[in-house]
Design a protein with these regions (language model features):
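Feature activates predominantly on carbohydrate-active enzymes
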Residues: 1-103, 107-132, 149, 207-210, ...
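Structured mid-domain segments that build the active-site/substrate or prosthetic-cofactor binding neighborhood
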Residues: 75-81, 89, 197-302, 306
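Conserved, mostly hydrophobic/aromatic
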Residues: 83, 102, 144, 178, ...
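Acidic, His- and aromatic-enriched active-site or binding-groove loops in soluble protein domains
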Residues: 121-139, 173-192, 245, 275-283
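Aromatic-lined carbohydrate-recognition surfaces of secreted/lumenal glycan-active proteins
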Residues: 135-165, 216-226, 253-256
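Substrate-binding cleft/loops of secretory-pathway carbohydrate-active enzymes
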Residues: 155-184, 229-237, 262-270
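Catalytic domains of carbohydrate-active enzymes that cleave complex glycans
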Residues: 276-429
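C-terminal membrane-anchoring or membrane-association module
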Residues: 443-458
Length: 458
């Protein structure tokens, strides 16, 4: 039997399409899943006549800001009335649903409404957007129970960006569910025994939220949104993370990876995390990864296992974080160093040699070759010929595999347009210490030369 009441995963397009078709059935109990403010209070319907319903930012009411959606003014009683009416309608029309989400929109730049009343409530709760949101949710939850006493109805929300921090002096109603996002998070060290500040912060965040609610669903990020194709060795922490969730009585976990074609190790990550959520922390993740690789890569399996072990070992050796928005340069002297990337390339080449002529296995190995080529072509300290060869491999494989997204919000065309400047910038960053030393030496030389000339004149 599964250890989690709610299990979800989004790491491959196939997984996402299956959910849309009703096969994955991940959020079947949810009316909305996330970022739902405007599903209740639409700016198209209300902004022109009631701008006060929407977030204040920079002294103005806004429903969009910096390319993203704004938020709602949750201290406005009329906003509550509109949301309550719509929420009760949805509950009544969807008896098959248990969870009805009301959560902030996805815009880092708009941290809630900044009107005087909203700021006062958030400040009183310890400087968190939950100061306005949680009382709002609790009121909805009480109303839902009163109107539908014979139904199991929960009101859910996201603890995300400005609502991430647990509030002081407020507890949730028994039918409120908090979906806590693993931010800042770190996929290089486990939450069970955090080895750095990012993992420790999320570890402690769970403890603080447990004082507020006993219904937590963790939204866990298992991806580098900045570099969807770079090697991302995070399998080693997953069993301990699962144990941490179980020990803290987490009700559910949703693992989010890349939603686009070709995400790094996406198919294996989908399988391993799905199985882990079902079996629980007693599962031997390392053994399951090896079994998967042996079944999927055939005679090339020993080299593929060697590759995954090498990336994980080199990350551990570097003691670096494995973050959600890591730039490759943060690992140039770690697991993505020139020497390490060349070693990965050698391992993958040996894997191809093992299965030469087996087009199916070669096609599967192509994704690993693509990941290594991507890491290599962004290195600042390789020759032009080697870089061009890596870029040519990358270009061929993304075309063959139909890969169009490099970052969560940046496509292949944009990446290719920026690539020459990225390489130049990377080289300059790598050379900057040397350039600084040369400049200092030149300045010192000029100063000494001027002093000598002055002495001669005197």
């Amino acid at each position: 039997m599964p250890t989690l009441r709610k299990r979800g995963i989004k790491v491959t397009p196939e997984n996402r399409r299956g959910t849309i078709l009703g096969k994955g059935r991940q959020h079947i109990d949810w009316q909305y899943w996330c970022h739902s403010y405007y599903d209740y209070v639409s700016p198209d319907e209300y902004f022109d006549t009631h701008p006060e319903y929407f977030s204040m930012k920079g002294g103005k009411r806004r429903y969009v800001y910096n390319g993203g959606e704004g938020q709602l003014c949750l201290s406005n009683p009329e906003v509550y009335d509109i949301v309550e009416k719509e929420m009760l309608r949805l509950i009544g029309e969807h008896p098959e649903k248990k969870y009805f989400d009301f959560s902030c929109n996805d815009n880092f730049w708009v941290k809630g409404c900044q009107c005087k009343e909203c700021k006062k409530l958030d400040k009183a709760a310890g400087g968190t957007g939950m100061g306005t949101l949680l009382p709002f949710l609790n009121k909805l939850a009480r109303k839902a129970r009163a109107v539908y006493p014979d139904r199991e109805v929960y009101i859910s929300t996201l603890a995300y960006f400005h609502t991430l921090k647990a509030p002081k002096g407020i507890k949730t109603e028994p039918n409120v569910v908090i979906k806590l996002c693993s931010m800042p998070g770190d996929q290089g060290t486990s939450y069970l025994d955090p080895g750095n500040g990012n993992a420790r912060e999320f570890h402690d965040m769970i403890a603080k939220w447990k004082e507020v609610t006993d219904k937590i669903v963790v939204w866990d990020y298992v991806v580098n949104f900045k570099n969807l194709l770079v090697p991302f060795p995070n399998f080693g922490v997953q069993r301990d993370n699962q144990q941490f969730f179980e020990e803290n009585n987490v009700q559910g976990v949703f693992h989010q990876g890349s939603r686009d074609e070709g995400g790094e190790s996406a198919i294996m990550r989908d399988y391993i995390l799905s199985k882990l959520m079902w079996e629980g922390s007693t599962m031997d993740v390392g053994g399951e990864v090896s079994r998967y690789i042996m079944a999927y890569y055939g005679e090339a399996a020993p080299e593929v296992i060697e590759y995954y072990n090498a990336t994980a070992a080199n990350l551990a050796k570097s003691s670096s974080t494995l973050g959600l928005y890591d730039n490759n340069m943060s690992h140039w002297f770690g697991y993505l160093s020139k020497g390490n990337v060349r070693r990965y390339e050698d391992i993958i080449n040996r894997a191809y040699d093992k299965v030469k002529g087996n087009e199916e296995i070669e096609s599967r190995l192509d994704y690993l070759r693509l990941n290594v080529a991507y890491a290599k072509m962004l290195l600042p300290n390789i020759g032009i010929k080697e870089r061009n060869e890596a870029k040519a491999t990358f270009d061929r494989l993304v075309d063959e595999k139909g890969i169009t997204m490099i970052e969560e919000l940046s496509n292949l065309d944009k990446f290719n347009a920026q690539y020459p400047m990225m390489v130049t910038t990377n080289v300059l960053i790598m050379l900057s210490p040397l350039i600084l030393v040369i400049l200092i030496a030149l300045i010192v030389g000029i100063v000494l030369l001027v002093k000598r000339k002055k002495k001669r004149k005197s």
